[in-house]
Amino acid sequence: MERKEQTMTFYSPEVIKIKGDLRYQRPTLPTNQQSVSTQKRQQYVNEACTYIRMFCGSLSGFSVLLLACTSPLNLVQFLVNNNGLELKAGLWTLCYHELCWSHTPKPPYYLQYSRALFLISILFMLISLGLLLSSCRPAERMMSAELDLKVSMLSFCSAVSLLLCLNLFLAQVELYTKNAMEYEFLWTYYLSWCSEVLYICVGIISFLNFITFQFHPPDEGVSADLWQKSRLGIGPVPKTLSATAERSRSEMQFLSGRQEKLQNVRKGKLATTRL
């Protein structure tokens, strides 16, 4: 027996076509007409600012750790022209050769200024990192937009200090390699420049976070006195109670009391009519 082929047809309903109007061809999707409440929107903004601060804190910590690991290493390699001797030195390390520098300060003091600016850069970044870490604690004062501005300024100051430090170290190297030696920077020197880029990124992100937080000020009707830990256990999440909820609760209590009074009055009238 021959099998009949099963065919499937798609149902296309008739659509009323209006001449010159092509809107019927545009599909319309259902939209949610319920707008987000002010309390919920403010909570989303606070959580976003907190996560951005945590990201900036991780970048700051990584950059400080990178500088701390590369600072005791050699940054430049020298090649003596006469005998082909290779020497290595860094910001805090010496090559112990007569052609290299020593710890004794000598004018124009490029090395000493470079070391001082390096310490200043680390200090600024540690202060910024401390502010970012303290903002993750449940404290209402740390949710202000001034914190992001402070972190941005400290990050830019740290970036400028590190930039001057690296440029002065370059001037120190060129001063000692004018005639007798040639130099070549090592990979640790370029990692220091990576820390410079991270400092600038932290400053830019914190400044953008400050601008965003200014356009979304905290709502006065929302009380952020009670705090609870987030799912990650790091960032603060406010446990708020809006004034509208309290008002609706008081209205419900008033209406329920009024209904009880009306029921009591009706019961009293029924009792009198029976008598």
From Swiss-Prot:
Name a GO CC annotation attached to this entry. membrane
Concerning Pfam families, the annotation shows: PMP22_Claudin (PF00822)
* InterPro entries in the cross-refs: PMP-22/EMP/MP20-like, PMP22/EMP/MP20/Claudin
Main localization, broad class: membrane
The answer, when asked if Transmembrane is one of the entry's keywords, is yes
Q: Which residues are listed as membrane-spanning? A: 60-80, 116-136, 151-171, 193-213
- Provide the topology term for how it sits in the membrane: Multi-pass membrane protein
- Source domain of life: Eukaryota
Q: Where in the cell is it found?
A: Membrane
What keywords is this UniProt entry annotated with?
Membrane, Transmembrane, Transmembrane helix
Q: Spell out the protein name for this chain.
A: Transmembrane protein 202
- As recorded in Swiss-Prot or TrEMBL, the protein's gene is named Tmem202
